[in-house]
């Protein structure tokens, strides 16, 4: 039993050391052509429309409901956005009041 534990520990150490081994640095100029995002390739008017319609997913109600603070966190989130408050609906989505 001790030998299996020692072998597993050595295997774990080997994996940790090899995954932490440094790679060759990549120059920013070489990586730039491959790192274009969709927003970089859009025309200006399409870019503005995409930015205006960009919506972040909200997990305030669903994640914090286990702690009993889902509605309070949703209301605080909505107040921070400039609304009068908010609540969690039956689908666990934060609905902000105007």
UniProtKB/Swiss-Prot annotation:
Induction: By bacterial infection. Disulfide bonds join 61-88, 74-94, 78-96. GO terms for cellular component: extracellular region; extracellular space. GO terms for biological process: defense response to bacterium; defense response to Gram-negative bacterium; defense response to Gram-positive bacterium; humoral immune response; innate immune response. It is found in: Secreted. Gene3D superfamilies: Knottin, scorpion toxin-like. Belongs to the invertebrate defensin family. Type 1 subfamily. This is Defensin-A. It comes from Aedes aegypti (Yellowfever mosquito).
């Amino acid at each position: 039993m001790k030998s299996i534990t020692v072998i597993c520990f050595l295997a774990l150490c080997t994996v940790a050391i090899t995954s932490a081994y440094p790679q060759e640095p990549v120059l920013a100029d070489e990586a730039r052509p491959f790192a274009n995002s969709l927003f970089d390739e859009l025309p200006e008017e399409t870019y503005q429309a995409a930015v205006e319609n960009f919506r972040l997913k909200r997990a305030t109600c669903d994640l914090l409901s286990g702690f009993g603070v889902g509605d309070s966190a949703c209301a605080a989130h909505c107040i921070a956005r400039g609304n009068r408050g908010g609540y969690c609906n039956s689908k666990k989505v934060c609905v902000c009041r105007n």
